[in-house]
């Protein structure tokens, strides 16, 4: 990972335009990881936007930064221009460009820096920088690890911690799946120390008026 971190540091140091995108029908891990990265980059004074292929579930509207998400299917021209004009595109919680729907038509791996951050198996080789680890519990956990490796852990505040916790919780069945280990709980300890409200996050997801079902271990 050290070589990938060095390459990523080089890209971020140039302060270029950045777009972050997710798979279609973004879930808790996709929204949590993309907004955690978005809020982190904003604290670094980077020019960054989050664009999702389509609308996320209403019960995720409370997530910090959610009001700044640009939904591609609602404004294809505007969102497409942002993606076309971005120097670097982060693709979160998926590992094949087909999974981001029509957004992929605006992405050019030959002229743009593509950065994959994902924890699913069998990634396709489309990104210049690939943070891909199926042994990690969630993409949110991987975002935390990358932030730590970049020396940005000190920038993680309550809002960013909330986003990270959201994805870790939803993609692990509230920390019941086999991907959860000691390292996962060390990260949870850090997030709790940032003041996140575990019960509030849980209630917003599982006790909302809209039923949310955590992905199975195979579909995380």
Please annotate each region the language model reported:
Residues 212-220:
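Single conserved hydrophobic/aromatic residue that forms the stacking wall/gate
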């Amino acid at each position: 990972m050290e070589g990938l971190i060095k390459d990523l540091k080089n890209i971020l140091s140039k302060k270029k335009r950045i777009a972050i995108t997710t798979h279609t029908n973004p879930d808790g891990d996709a929204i949590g990881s993309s907004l955690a990265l978005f809020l982190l980059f904003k604290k670094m004074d980077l020019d960054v936007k989050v664009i999702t292929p389509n609308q996320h579930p209403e019960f995720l509207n409370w997530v910090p930064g959610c009001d700044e998400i640009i939904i591609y299917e609602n404004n294809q021209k505007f969102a497409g221009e942002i993606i076309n004009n971005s120097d670097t595109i982060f693709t979160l919680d998926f590992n094949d460009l087909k999974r981001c729907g029509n957004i992929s038509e605006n992405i050019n791996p030959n002229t743009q820096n593509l950065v994959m951050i994902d924890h699913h198996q069998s990634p396709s080789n489309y990104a210049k920088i690939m943070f891909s680890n199926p042994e990690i519990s969630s993409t949110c956990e991987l975002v935390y690890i990358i932030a730590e490796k970049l020396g940005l852990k000190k920038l993680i505040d309550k809002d960013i911690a909330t986003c990270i916790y959201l994805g870790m919780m939803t993609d692990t069945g509230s920390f019941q799946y086999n991907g959860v280990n000691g390292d996962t709980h060390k990260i949870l300890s850090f997030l709790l120390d940032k003041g996140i409200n575990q019960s509030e996050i849980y209630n917003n997801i599982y006790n909302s008026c809209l039923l949310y079902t955590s992905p199975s271990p195979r579909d995380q």
